[in-house]
Amino acid sequence: ATTRCDPTLIPIAGGWFELLEGGEALRYRCPPGHIPTPLARRSCGPDGQXEPLXXXXXXXXXXXXXXXXKCRAVWCPPPQDMEHGSFWPRLPRYPPGSRLHFQCFQGFNLRGAPNRTCGEGGRWSGVTPVCDDGSGDCPAPPVXXXXXKEGSRYLLEDTVRFRCGPGLVLLGSAVRQCLEGGVWSGTEPQCRAPLSFDTPSDVAASFMASLSQSVERADSNSSHGPTEKLPRXIRVDGSAXLNVFLLXDA
């Protein structure tokens, strides 16, 4: 007999579900700005009951069972105090659609996005803004929302350290060093909430940024022409993360 999910045994608080594979599995759906927890997809057994609700606990590296599925709100983390600048409005957390505005104190120039919007996936749009006066060998390093930075010297071989607030996970380099050429080692750190995720627009923006930097760029100090395609390379150090996205055209 064909296994089918029993609709009376698989509700989700605040959302709905759709049956897949002829009723042998289901996918939970939530309103915009929310995500199904502890999982988004379930399979059903011969008796029509769905598999147990279990999610991996990062801290204990074990699975924790939940009594019922529910839709939980996704929030963007609040920024820490901006070095040599300020931002508004100041809230404990920001729902999708919220906007932040940044400005620098006198004598400092703003690099990055002066305005950022909280996306549906719990991530801020645009480039992390920093206030820089040009006095260091390296520019002021970006400090992502909810990250704290240790170190305020940006001369050659100086290092800065980053950490995230409680309940957030650091992705990227926890330690960065000012290198020759005025660049920082590693990758920009991000503090991500456990429920945040990459939306299709986030993925598209990442691809476009990568292509614009490596496919058709003109180097005034080399023999490359303005439209000559250059080799594309991916550099990942020991403390960085590499996200691989697979796109399937159905």
From Swiss-Prot:
Summary of the function given for this chain in its UniProt record: Required in both the classical and alternate pathways of the complement system.
Top-rank lineage group of the source organism: Eukaryota
GO MF annotations in UniProt: serine-type peptidase activity
Glycosylation sites: 115, 221
Major localization listed first in the record, in broad terms: secreted
Protein name as catalogued: Complement factor B-like protease
Class of enzymatic activity (EC top level): hydrolase
Keyword Secreted: yes
GO cellular component: extracellular region
Keywords: Complement alternate pathway, Complement pathway, Disulfide bond, Glycoprotein, Hydrolase, Immunity, Innate immunity, Protease, Repeat, Secreted, Serine protease, Sushi
InterPro entries: Sushi/SCR/CCP_sf, Sushi_SCR_CCP_dom
GO biological process, one term: complement activation, classical pathway
Compartments in which it is found: Secreted
Family to which the UniProt record says this protein belongs: Belongs to the peptidase S1 family.
This protein's record includes keyword Disulfide bond: yes
Expressing tissues: Plasma.
All copies of domain Sushi, residue ranges: 3-73, 74-133, 136-193
E.C. numbers: 3.4.21.-
Pfam families, per the entry: Sushi
Cysteines joined through disulfide linkages: 5-44, 30-71, 76-118, 104-131, 138-178, 164-191
Segments traversing the membrane: none
Taxonomy of the source species: Eukaryota, Metazoa, Chordata, Craniata, Vertebrata
